[in-house]
Amino acid sequence: MNHGRRSAAIARPFLENLGLPADAVNEICYGIAIHVDDEADFEWKRTPFCETVGDADNIDRFDAYRIYETLEYLEFSKMSLGDKQEKVVSTIEKLINFKEMKLGTVTAKKLWIQRLDYYIGFYEKLKAQMDSSSSIV
């Protein structure tokens, strides 16, 4: 809870000790504060730079290990074939919808789409394999 705002409070003294200009410290801290839920506990202007903190966090979260971690958390291996198929289809739909998410920069958007395409490719392959199976235990 309040992960972004607490992280900004931790980062602020460090950034100030680096001797960065106050505007730079505020912009970095604002980006950190809003990166989870778009809320900060201080006023600042939202800039593409601020948005890159959340963008980087989201892009980083969509990697190969997270696929494994998610499937483990869902206890995917214990699901029936039908439940697995439903979960995979709903995941693909969700990932396709994520492509519409607004990001702060063109580069972030390209990286985001690459990560989503990687995930979608994995889940489409998993779906194809399950669709050709009569049972997967």
Predicted regions and their residues:
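An active-site-proximal "capping" alpha-helix that borders the catalytic cofactor pocket
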Residues: 2-17
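Short acidic, glycine/Ser/Thr-rich loop/turn "cap" segments at secondary-structure junctions
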Residues: 14, 36-37
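Acidic/histidine metal-binding catalytic segments
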Residues: 16-33
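Divalent metal-dependent phosphate-bond-processing catalytic cores, especially two-metal-ion Mg2+/Mn2+ enzymes
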Residues: 20, 39-137
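Short alpha-helical scaffolding segments that buttress acidic/His motifs in well-ordered protein cores
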Residues: 28-36, 53-56
